[in-house]
């Protein structure tokens, strides 16, 4: 699954950014949310009470880091602050985000595959290793509110998921010979073998 950044740049990741209408309905997610909010700011006009139009919207930019930085215990009652200092329940923001990504993926699957039903999918959400039970419960309830069935949902710790990815990702073994294209090398790929050494680094919330 790829996302468009800036209208043309394709990326396998997108921003954890959400734009909600004044009535708290999801308007846009990811790079699209950033683009739409920037446009709202540019086109904004003052209303009769001196409030700019864009200030009526809820804009949570990179809200995943807000969850990392929440003071105290992260619970189902935790509130997070948007870019204009308006607060909403973290559970609402997470639920809308998960629901969007779920529906986005299902739409792509239906376009590319035949016979895949929603019940065929088991969803795995990665969470920080330092999260306690209350934070995990927040994420579980958010996922269920986002439309994922409880019996089709599992969690994996982010470092463990990164480690499994390192074991399964195919790496270039060698470049030898030439392909049918002049000057192009023929590459050999394989997954890591038993005994392969690798390192998973945590850079301030970003897992490599």
What are these language model-derived features?
Residues 2-146:
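Phosphate-binding loop and its immediate beta->loop->alpha context
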Residues 147-161:
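Conserved phosphate-binding/catalytic loops in two-lobed NTP-binding clefts
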Residues 121-128, 155-156, 198-202:
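Extended hydrophobic secondary-structure segments that form protein cores and membrane-embedded regions
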Residues 96-115, 166-189:
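Phosphate/ATP-binding catalytic cores across multiple sugar-kinase/actin-like superfamilies
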Residues 1-3, 56-58, 170-208:
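Gly/Thr-rich phosphate-binding beta-strand-loop-beta motif of the actin/hexokinase/Hsp70
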Residues 136-139, 165-169:
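Short acidic, glycine/serine/threonine-rich loops at helix termini
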Residues 145-151, 174-177:
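Secondary-structure transition/capping motifs at alpha-helix termini
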Residues 67, 129-131, 157-160, 202-207:
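Short, flexible loop/turn elements at secondary-structure junctions
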């Amino acid at each position: 699954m790829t996302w468009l950044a800036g209208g043309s740049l394709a990326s396998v990741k997108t921003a954890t950014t959400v734009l909600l209408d004044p009535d708290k309905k999801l308007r846009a997610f990811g790079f699209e949310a950033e683009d739409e909010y920037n446009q709202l700011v540019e086109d904004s006009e003052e209303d009769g009470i001196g409030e700019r139009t864009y200030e009526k919207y809820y804009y949570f930019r990179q809200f995943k880091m807000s969850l990392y930085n929440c003071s105290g215990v992260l619970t189902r009652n935790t509130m997070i602050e948007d870019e204009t200092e308006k607060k909403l329940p973290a559970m609402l923001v997470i639920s809308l985000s998960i629901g969007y990504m779920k529906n986005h993926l299902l739409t792509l699957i239906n376009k590319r595959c035949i016979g895949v039903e929603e019940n065929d999918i088991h969803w795995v959400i990665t969470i920080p290793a330092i999260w306690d039970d209350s934070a995990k419960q927040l994420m579980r309830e958010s996922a269920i509110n986002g439309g994922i069935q409880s019996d089709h949902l599992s969690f994996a710790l982010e470092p463990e998921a990164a480690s499994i990815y390192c074991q399964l990702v195919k790496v270039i073994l060698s470049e030898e010979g030439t392909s049918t294209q002049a000057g192009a090398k023929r590459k050999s790929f394989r997954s890591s073998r038993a005994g392969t050494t690798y390192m998973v680094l945590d850079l301030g919330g970003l897992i490599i």
